[in-house]
Amino acid sequence: MRITRREKKFWEQHLSCVRHITLDPKGPGVVRLHMIPPRAEGKDEPFLLLLNGAKLIPLNLSWAILLANFMAALEHFFTEGDNAPDREVKQADWERLAEEAVTATRSVYPRTKPEQLREDLALLMESLIAIARGQEPPVEVGTLSLGDYAPYMSAPHRMDLMVSAMTQDGAWHCNQKCLHCYAAGQPMGESRELTTAQWKEALERLRHANIPQV
């Protein structure tokens, strides 16, 4: 199914990269969200929502746009003041941010009633929080395996990097004491360590490749 001009413009401006927020709702645990674009534009290919680094949830384009606008509102909330990183999101703030997301989403879907978007956003967030806590969501949400989503992936959802060389000059070099080490004894275990500038370049390349977790 083809996407509209408004959807295409929004996708190019706001959905071509990985979007991320971490929520700390009342109750146990946090909700860490990575929204990853599919390989190609189109309504038939779902976005991937990576929930707490483990659960994979497909998201259609309209809900991806709604969630992206809510993420943007939250990001602005936490960067608009000197003490922004320590601010608590009170109920009145949450409702205001949700309303900002609804207004922004209506610029893409002007014929959709605000009430419908408010209900959709509330249902989406309630469902994601429930899934993150291992509870039943208010509506049935289809989860995916990596094998199911592989044809649509624009990049791997995780990249593990070896920070330190395991050995140098034939002697053990790593200062970590991990219970299980899968880097020991590997052919690249004695590779030359990167400089700070090289690490920054590597991380920037991973960001541009849409790999959400490192």
Which functions belong to the PLM regions below?
Residues K55, Y109-P110:
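Short, polar/flexible loop-turn hinges at active-site or ligand-entry regions and domain interfaces
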Residues M1-F78, A84-R87:
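Acidic, low-complexity/disordered tracts enriched in E/D and polar residues
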Residues H76-V108:
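Short acidic, hydrophobic short linear motifs in intrinsically disordered regions
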Residues T4, R87-W94, P110, P114-L121:
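Intrinsic-disorder-associated interaction segments
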Residues V108-Y109, Q116-S127, I131-V214:
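Conserved alpha-helical substructure of the radical SAM core
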